[in-house]
Amino acid sequence: MKTFFQFDELGTSYRNEIIGGLTTFLSMAYILFVNPITLALESVKDFPEALRIDQGAVFTATALASAAGCILMGLIARYPIAIAPGMGLNAFFAFSVVLGMGISWQAALSGVFISGLIFVALSLTGFREKIINAIPPELKLAVGAGIGLFITFVGLQGSGIITANPSTLVTIGNIHSGPVLLTIFGVIVTVILMVLRVNAGVFIGMLLTAVAGMIFGLVPVPTQIIGSVPSLAPTFGQAWIHLPDIFSVQMLIVILTFLFVGFFDTAGTLVAVATQAGLMKENKLPRAGRALLADSSSIVIGAVLGTSTTTSYVESSSGVAAGARSGFAAIVTGILFLLATFFSPLLSVVTSNVTAPALIIVGALMVAPLGKIAWDKFEVAVPAFLTMIMMPLTYSIATGIAIGFIFYPITMVCKGKAKEVHPIMYGLFVVFILYFIFLK
């Protein structure tokens, strides 16, 4: 086993890999509780109960899809990179697709399933490099930052810190109410933990927020901690049962968004974590195709089980910092996700006010790369800015992407740089124009 995972070559050991895998798990364990709450639109109180996805099934699907993704990454690509349903992508699934477009969660899972199959095909061919090179780096960065702003807004809104206002659209909520104060407490605690660089700061912040909520009667006290694994029956297989529902221009945009965000989120995370671990060779990632295949395969598995798009987690960097260097650490993380399926009773503790701090803080982390955008170049700065700002303002990640991708060819052509725009970008320009003409 040491030979397979190249322990000697990488200068690692079982101890380092186990500690690294555990550290990564604790750093991203929050997704087990945030994902069900998000996909079920728990913060939207007037959403019909009959149309909500089952939280228990999503919890199990999240754990199993994460376990499968981590183990595949460890075995196929042999990288210490963990996989789980992506923050931002789950918000797009719930708030943009289900709530905003009125698409059923079953059809949305079908969209995730198809995007995963396309991702698998791209991972097996050389076309993936063409896709990566087609999208300008400024737009890639803007999409990530825009999603960060979006999920931060979702967290602020769902917790009651921001509420609706007929004159100004939004305003600050009742900051004297218990639930809002609990969220503010959670944000402060989590920020302090992150500033102090405490491993698993987001997860620990959620735990402390939940405990504070129980002390002051704002969060129900669980009757048990360990219980039976929630059934997958409500969600399992819905992705392929509802495949006939995907044949529309609206669903095409949804699938493209799932594919685009998932693809570039994964590519960026792989490079970032591999660079930190010293695994890059001549500025290239060895076995990149295998890593993308592991990631894309987990998307298909997750959709069938009943969760939104999975992706490589940048929190894997915490495991690398703790000593992880090989795929063995990812397998350790995967096994821990399997064990986590028995902790479903804790879902009752994780209210929208407990998860809101995680959304707000993770959103802030996603905005960090904005400094890499050439803001002094107006032809790329404007499309990037519009991509980013229109996501929270229109409450739609897809709309933000569409607007940015429409403006980019326009500004580049006006600047006399038409030849620098990849043909794929012109194709997307036409697709998104048709999207606004016929669907908006």
Swiss-Prot record:
Phenotype caused by lack of the gene: Cells lacking this gene show normal growth on inosine as the purine source, normal hypoxanthine-guanine phosphoribosyltransferase activity, and are resistant to azaguanine.
Stretches that traverse the bilayer: 18-38, 57-77, 81-101, 107-127, 142-162, 175-195, 201-221, 251-271, 291-311, 327-347, 354-374, 388-408, 419-439
InterPro entries in the cross-refs: Azg-like (IPR045018), Azg-like_bact_archaea (IPR026033), NCS2 (IPR006043)
Topology relative to the membrane: Multi-pass membrane protein
Statement: the UniProt record of this protein carries the keyword Cell membrane: yes
Compartmental location: Cell membrane
Key word Nucleotide-binding present: no
Stimuli inducing this protein: Expression is regulated by both purR and xptR regulons. Negatively regulated by hypoxanthine and guanine.
One Pfam family here: Xan_ur_permease
A Gene Ontology cellular-component term: plasma membrane
Keywords recorded for this protein, A-Z: Cell membrane, Membrane, Transmembrane, Transmembrane helix, Transport
Coiled-coil intervals: none
First-listed, main subcellular location of the protein, grouped into a coarse class: membrane
GO molecular function: purine nucleobase transmembrane transporter activity
Family stated for the protein in its record: Belongs to the nucleobase:cation symporter-2 (NCS2) (TC 2.A.40) family. Azg-like subfamily.
Known role: Involved in the uptake of the purine bases hypoxanthine and guanine.
Name the UniProt record assigns to this protein: Guanine/hypoxanthine permease PbuG
Source species of the chain: Bacillus subtilis (strain 168)
Lineage, top ranks: Bacteria, Bacillati, Bacillota, Bacilli, Bacillales
